Amino acid sequence: MAVKERVGVVVSDKMDKTVVVAIENRSPHPKYGKIVVKTQKFKAHDAENQAKQGDRVRIRETRPLSKTKRWEVAEILTDS
């Protein structure tokens, strides 16, 4: 099974070793064709607390680390 990876923006870094990453999905409306932007938020494990709010990061799926945390920060793409 392939490892799932996604790219998003850190919207919160207030928790210890955890960041909240927002990922935008753009798709056309099935009937009207207008581009609709849907945002999903994922909690991701950041072991060294390196990611800051506004950073663009790549996250990868991992085993469940807590009740809501199933992703980890793979790399920081751009700094805020």
From Swiss-Prot:
Q: Which Pfam family, an example, fits this chain?
A: Ribosomal_S17
Keywords carried by this UniProt record: Ribonucleoprotein, Ribosomal protein, RNA-binding, rRNA-binding
Q: What Gene Ontology terms for biological process does this UniProt record contain?
A: translation
CDD domains assigned to the protein according to its UniProt record, in alphabetical order: Ribosomal_uS17
Q: Is this entry keyworded Ribonucleoprotein?
A: yes
Task: Provide the family line.
Answer: Belongs to the universal ribosomal protein uS17 family.
> NCBIfam families from the entry?
PRK05610.1 (NF004123), uS17_bact (TIGR03635)
Check the record and name the HAMAP family matching this protein.
Ribosomal_uS17_B
Assembly and binders: Part of the 30S ribosomal subunit.
Physiological role: One of the primary rRNA binding proteins, it binds specifically to the 5'-end of 16S ribosomal RNA.
Q: What protein name is recorded for this chain?
A: Small ribosomal subunit protein uS17
Gene name, please?
A: rpsQ
